[in-house]
Amino acid sequence: MRILITGVTGFIGGHLAERLNGAGWAVRGLARAPEHAAALAAQDIEIVQGSLLDRGSLASCMYACDAVIHAGAWTGTPGVPEDEAWTTNVAATGWLLEAARQARISRFVYLSSVAAYGVNRAPVIDETARTPLVGQLYPDSKIAAETLVRGAGEQGLATTIVRPASTYGPRGGAWTIGPIEQIKAGSLVLLGKDEGLVNTGYIDNFVNGVLLALSSPAAVGETFNICDGVTTTYRDFYMRYAAMLGKASLPTVPAFLARGAATSPGRWLRRLMGKQPPGPWSVHFRFNPSRFSIDKASRLLGYTPSISLDEAMRRTEAWLRDAGYLAAGETG
């Protein structure tokens, strides 16, 4: 069985490629810059050059494949024009779906995001919750792409949508290396008590869930939240990284200042705080009161996260130390 993975040079895509390769799949990874996939190529993973912005390369790279995991996306990288970001996340998904239909692909798994739930603040959010447009590029693009995936499913393509949450672990960017580097630079601040909830998704748990979604007949036509199914506070999550760096505390700003500085009229507050605060979308998540339910994935796929937060952080710290992000004198 041969599978195409987009976004293979990314955190999630790379881990999926390695796991599927180890499970006996013939893995083909789409990479805009193949040199960034040298470690995967060294494991006999086929790397083909192409871009989500190049419709022709998306069709050609699907030759002789049986399945697709679409993990590639614009995830908020600054400096990318809005039309390019939208094309990457939405139009390219449509092109991939069309190419998959033409190639008679047997399974198509799309990695979306819990950001599709928008500003829903219910205590527990499952897959039946509405996904309204919120006027923010990233979540709105994920909602639009999901609509295309469902449409392709109605036309006969065996599709599944997976919504990850805060996925972290070895090689992770936004939820692993990012916080470590921000803490080192003194730019990561706690917002008041920072008791908003992080819906963690340790990478090995998440990959297990995606593989179940890929292989289970019960997943066809369905949408799943895939994360650890438990929460911790932002304060606890970030303080675990701080402890790895030998820090007992982090800079804190009052919550009301953070909320105000995230608004357009809050420029004076940004100067007062002396730091670049999170934007409105980030602030929403920092004060998030919700847990994303994985009951559906458990019921239909048999998904059970096996690695606890404590064990996941232990493994993550070991990788950070081996990779040189934690100095020899820093102790966790």
What label would you give each PLM region?
Residues 169, 191-196, 224-231, 242-246, ...:
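Glycine-rich Rossmann NAD(P)(H)-binding loop
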Residues 50, 232, 240, 276-332:
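C-terminal amphipathic/interface module of NAD(P)-dependent oxidoreductases
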Residues 144-145, 173-178, 192-214, 221-225:
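Substrate-positioning beta->alpha
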Residues 36-41, 45-88, 99, 117:
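NAD(P)H-binding glycine-rich loop region in Rossmannoid oxidoreductase-like domains
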Residues 87, 91, 121-167, 188-192:
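Catalytic helix-loop patch of NAD(P)-dependent Rossmann-fold dehydrogenases
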Residues 3-23:
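N-terminal Rossmann NAD(P)H-binding glycine-rich loop of SDR-like oxidoreductase domains
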Residues 212-277, 294, 314-317, 327-330:
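Mid/C-terminal beta-alpha module of Rossmann-like enzyme folds, strongest
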Residues 95-137:
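Conserved Rossmann-fold NAD(P)-dependent oxidoreductase catalytic core, especially the SDR/UDP-sugar
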